């Protein structure tokens, strides 16, 4: 599908006498017909099992052979791969555990994905503020869903985070989420919205499966309570105010042990 809201006129039909609205709709449709030749297109899949992931890499191979390019093809490009891993449980403490694991690995993920300078500069997949990270990693933080949603959207009133929790929170309590952030683009679903990786479809060595496996590191850490507690304590005590690169080095060394 075309990656431009402007190229998709609203589904609402203007009243018969509203000449300005009808003219605007015609203009939007005409502009959409023109810009569809250079606007990027998105590949959107329905929910799929992990076993089907190789079909995405095969699709990328075929598109690459037809001339498709990704972020690295131009300094002007800021294309991404967005994954929506289904949550194993909607229990707030389970979601919080995985979220904490992500916060601990996010600096490392940002480094190993080698996100382009343009995507780093643009607002669409920004890291969480360090003070919010510290609050979530605090040992005494045990929110229920209403408190978690309140704290998250008060500190992050945006979809533009590297791990967007808005769709998941809307699935749990849509009215509460939209009371904080009235954005029609938030679509409720029982998944995380992982927005960090670049699309490098023009590179034969690049793989959607590689990006998925990097996400799996988050789930593995979350599934190891002892390791999660140790990583949390180390980060909070020594690295929360340190340069990002220091924690990246520490995390890389820990993952290689």
Where are each of the predicted segments found?
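C-terminal accessory/tail domains of diverse enzymes
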Residues: 1-41, 47-58, 65, 90, ...
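Structured core elements
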Residues: 82-84, 193
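Catalytic palm subdomain of template-directed nucleic-acid polymerases
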Residues: 86-88
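Short, conserved phosphate-binding/catalytic loop or strand-edge motifs used
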Residues: 75-82
């Amino acid at each position: 599908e075309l990656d431009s809201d402007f190229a998709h006129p609203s589904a609402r039909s203007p009243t018969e006498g509203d000449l300005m609205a009808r003219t605007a709709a015609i203009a939007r449709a005409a502009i959409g017909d023109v810009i569809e030749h250079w606007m990027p297109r998105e590949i959107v899949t329905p929910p799929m099992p992990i076993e089907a992931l190789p079909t995405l890499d095969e699709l990328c191979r075929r598109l690459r052979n037809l001339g498709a390019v990704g972020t690295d093809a131009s300094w002007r490009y800021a294309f991404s791969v967005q994954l929506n891993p289904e949550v194993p449980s909607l229990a707030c403490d389970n979601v919080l555990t995985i979220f904490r694991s992500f916060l601990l690995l996010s600096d490392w993920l940002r480094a190993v994905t080698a996100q382009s300078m343009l995507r780093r500069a643009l607002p669409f997949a920004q890291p969480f503020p360090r003070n919010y990270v510290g609050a979530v990693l605090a040992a005494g933080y045990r929110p229920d869903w209403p408190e978690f949603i309140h704290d998250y959207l008060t500190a992050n009133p945006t979809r533009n985070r590297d791990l967007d929790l808005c769709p998941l929170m809307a699935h749990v309590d849509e009215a509460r989420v939209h009371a904080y952030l009235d954005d029609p683009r938030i679509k409720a679903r029982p998944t995380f919205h992982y927005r960090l990786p670049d699309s490098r479809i023009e590179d034969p060595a690049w793989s959607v499966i590689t990006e998925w496996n990097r996400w799996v590191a988050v789930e593995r850490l979350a599934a190891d309570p002892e390791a999660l507690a140790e990583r949390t304590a180390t980060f909070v005590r020594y690295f929360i105010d340190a340069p990002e690169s220091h924690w990246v080095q520490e995390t890389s060394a820990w993952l290689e042990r």
